[in-house]
């Protein structure tokens, strides 16, 4: 066999191995829930990015987003890191959330926000 023929066969074998490995790797990612696999598939890391695991009630992105924005606004007013985290603790069922609610939201909307906390909470 000539040197050129051997080289071309080695290149062909290498290509087959690379293609086989890449398709096997891609198939293994299809069922994977790792963050890397999610990024490769072009999906977000989590459908429930704002989800607090302490919230055992109904998962409603809109309600959770509204409650979370209240905590963000409260943090922006007071600029203390503990405000943002404590406001969200126990699925918004805490005294910091109530204080933020009283400070930022008109009184006629308090019951609505408290109902949202009950819906997403325990």
Swiss-Prot record:
<dbReference type="InterPro" id="IPR000346">
    <property type="entry name" value="Hyperglycemic1"/>
</dbReference>
<comment type="similarity">
    <text>Belongs to the arthropod CHH/MIH/GIH/VIH hormone family.</text>
</comment>
<feature type="disulfide bond">
    <location>
        <begin position="71"/>
        <end position="87"/>
    </location>
</feature>
<dbReference type="InterPro" id="IPR035957">
    <property type="entry name" value="Crust_neurohorm_sf"/>
</dbReference>
<comment type="function">
    <text>Hormone found in the sinus gland of isopods and decapods which controls the blood sugar level. Has a secretagogue action over the amylase released from the midgut gland. May act as a stress hormone and may be involved in the control of molting and reproduction.</text>
</comment>
<keyword id="KW-0964">Secreted</keyword>
<dbReference type="InterPro" id="IPR018251">
    <property type="entry name" value="Crust_neurhormone_CS"/>
</dbReference>
<keyword id="KW-0165">Cleavage on pair of basic residues</keyword>
<keyword id="KW-0372">Hormone</keyword>
<protein>
    <recommendedName>
        <fullName>Crustacean hyperglycemic hormones 5</fullName>
    </recommendedName>
</protein>
<keyword id="KW-0732">Signal</keyword>
<dbReference type="InterPro" id="IPR001166">
    <property type="entry name" value="Hyperglycemic"/>
</dbReference>
<feature type="disulfide bond">
    <location>
        <begin position="74"/>
        <end position="100"/>
    </location>
</feature>
<dbReference type="GO" id="GO:0007218">
    <property type="term" value="P:neuropeptide signaling pathway"/>
</dbReference>
<dbReference type="Pfam" id="PF01147">
    <property type="entry name" value="Crust_neurohorm"/>
</dbReference>
<dbReference type="GO" id="GO:0007623">
    <property type="term" value="P:circadian rhythm"/>
</dbReference>
<dbReference type="GO" id="GO:0005576">
    <property type="term" value="C:extracellular region"/>
</dbReference>
<feature type="modified residue" description="Valine amide">
    <location>
        <position position="120"/>
    </location>
</feature>
<dbReference type="GO" id="GO:0005184">
    <property type="term" value="F:neuropeptide hormone activity"/>
</dbReference>
<dbReference type="GO" id="GO:0006006">
    <property type="term" value="P:glucose metabolic process"/>
</dbReference>
<feature type="signal peptide">
    <location>
        <begin position="1"/>
        <end position="26"/>
    </location>
</feature>
<keyword id="KW-0119">Carbohydrate metabolism</keyword>
<feature type="disulfide bond">
    <location>
        <begin position="55"/>
        <end position="91"/>
    </location>
</feature>
<keyword id="KW-1015">Disulfide bond</keyword>
<keyword id="KW-0313">Glucose metabolism</keyword>
<keyword id="KW-0527">Neuropeptide</keyword>
<dbReference type="InterPro" id="IPR031098">
    <property type="entry name" value="Crust_neurohorm"/>
</dbReference>
<keyword id="KW-0027">Amidation</keyword>
């Amino acid at each position: 066999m000539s040197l050129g023929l051997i080289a071309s066969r080695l290149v062909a074998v290498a290509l087959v191995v690379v293609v086989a490995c890449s398709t096997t790797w891609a198939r293994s990612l299809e069922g994977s829930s790792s963050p890397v696999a999610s990024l490769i598939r072009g999906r977000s890391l989590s459908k429930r990015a704002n989800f607090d695991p302490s919230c055992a009630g109904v998962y409603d992105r809109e309600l959770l987003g509204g409650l979370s924005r209240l905590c963000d606004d409260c943090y922006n007013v007071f600029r203390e890191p503990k405000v943002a985290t404590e406001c969200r603790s126990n699925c918004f069922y805490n005294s910091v959330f109530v204080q933020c609610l009283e400070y930022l939201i008109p009184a006629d909307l308090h019951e609505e926000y408290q109902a949202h906390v009950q819906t997403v909470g325990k």
